[in-house]
Swiss-Prot record:
The gene is ihfB. The keyword Aminoacyl-tRNA synthetase does not apply. Belongs to the bacterial histone-like protein family. The keyword Lipid metabolism does not apply. This is Integration host factor subunit beta. GO terms for molecular function: DNA binding; structural constituent of chromatin. CDD domains: IHF_B. InterPro entries: Hist_DNA-bd (IPR000119), Histone-like_DNA-bd_CS (IPR020816), IHF-like_DNA-bd_dom_sf (IPR010992), IHF_beta (IPR005685). HAMAP family: IHF_beta. GO terms for cellular component: chromosome; cytosol. GO terms for biological process: DNA recombination; regulation of DNA-templated transcription; regulation of translation. Keywords: DNA recombination, DNA-binding, Transcription, Transcription regulation, Translation regulation. It comes from Roseobacter denitrificans (strain ATCC 33942 / OCh 114) (Erythrobacter sp. (strain OCh 114)).
Length: 94
């Protein structure tokens, strides 16, 4: 499912809301989650999961094509840990 499909699904299930309002709400949610993660904060959605940022240390890597060793800088990457309710639902335990 892509963002536009999510917006359409929410708008269809809530006919009292205009699609442009739903789009604004969805975009605001994504902006807030992104902003919180950019600040290094954890975003937890109970039952669904938690978004956080993990630090990857600098390391020596290898170019798989040439075999040449390369220095890979330290970086921060997004991380998602599923919540118990989501995990159970995915495994047919709901």
């Amino acid at each position: 499912m892509i963002r536009s499909e999510l917006i359409q699904k929410i708008a269809d299930e809530n006919p009292h809301l205009y699609q442009r309002d739903v789009e604004r709400i969805v975009n605001t949610i994504f902006e807030e989650v992104t902003g919180a993660m950019a600040r290094g904060d954890r975003v937890e959605l109970r039952g669904f999961g938690a978004f956080s940022v993990k630090k990857r240390d600098a390391r020596i890597g290898r170019n798989p094509r040439t075999g040449e060793t390369v220095h890979v800088e330290e970086k921060h990457v997004p991380f998602f840990k599923t919540g118990k309710l989501l995990r159970d639902r995915l495994n047919g335990k709901s």
